[in-house]
Design a protein with these regions (language model features):
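Flavin (FAD/FMN)-binding glycine-rich loop and adjacent Rossmann-like elements that form
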Residues: 1-12, 16-221
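Calmodulin-binding IQ motif helices
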Residues: 224
Length: 224
């Protein structure tokens, strides 16, 4: 098992992360982020339903979760909260607010992650603004990065309408589109050779203090 940053030689990449984070690391262009409120879904098990100004819906599911002889209610919340920017810090702040609003001592389980549809999309080869009669009619160009060769985004950051992204990213449609995309990508890269060398992208940043890298050559022992 290896940890840390690695470079893998490949013909193409399908980024299946929720917010296209791999595409971001590669420098894929995106639409400008617009700060504002958006909806987040979060599910808890065992708690009593909560009320808060940020909660716009609290739906108790018809089927509880049963463990042995015990039965636990399942509540799916929809929150309306502001997202300051596209950083993980802002998303973590939203998640903490939601967890604080819904937790009580009776909770036995909860969602690992928030479910939401990012407003920001990649710049694709060709945006799609329609409503397909079949998932097969979805053009793969809307999932392919415009400025990074052979990079596809299998997630809600594809350049499709946000309402459509919410439908596409449900488990069953997402699995089907993943298979369809895999077939498409395999055909397109069939005759492309694997790169002879791995290239690690270096981010260009500006900072006031870059710090210093050093090494301890002597060790002082402290006796207590």
């Amino acid at each position: 098992i290896r940890s840390g940053r690695q470079a893998i030689r490949c013909k193409a990449i399908i980024d299946a992360t929720h917010n296209a984070s791999v595409a971001g690391l590669l420098g894929a262009e995106r639409k400008p982020f617009i700060a504002g409120s958006q909806e987040f879904c979060y599910t808890v098990v065992g708690n009593t339903p909560k009320e808060a100004p940020e909660i716009i819906q609290a739906e108790e599911l018809s089927q509880p979760i049963k463990v042995g002889e015990k039965s636990y209610p399942v509540t799916r919340y929809t929150f309306h909260l502001p997202l300051k920017d596209d950083s993980y810090a802002s998303l973590a702040e939203v998640e903490q607010i939601i967890r604080n609003r819904t937790w009580d001592i009776d909770q036995v389980d909860s969602s690992d992650l928030l479910w939401y549809i990012p407003k920001q999309t990649i710049n694709s080869e060709k945006a799609y603004n329609g409503n397909p009669v079949s998932w097969r009619k979805l053009p793969m160009q809307a999932f392919k990065s415009k400025n990074i060769a052979n990079l596809w985004v299998l997630g809600p950051c594809a350049e499709i309408p946000r309402e459509l992204a919410a439908k596409v990213m449900r488990p069953v449609p997402a699995l089907f589109i993943g298979e369809m995309m895999g077939e498409t990508v395999a055909r397109q890269i069939k005759d492309i050779p694997v790169p002879a060398q791995a290239t690690v992208r270096q981010l260009k940043v500006n900072a006031s203090n870059y710090g210093q890298t050093g090494e301890l050559l002597s060790l002082s022992l402290i006796h207590i």
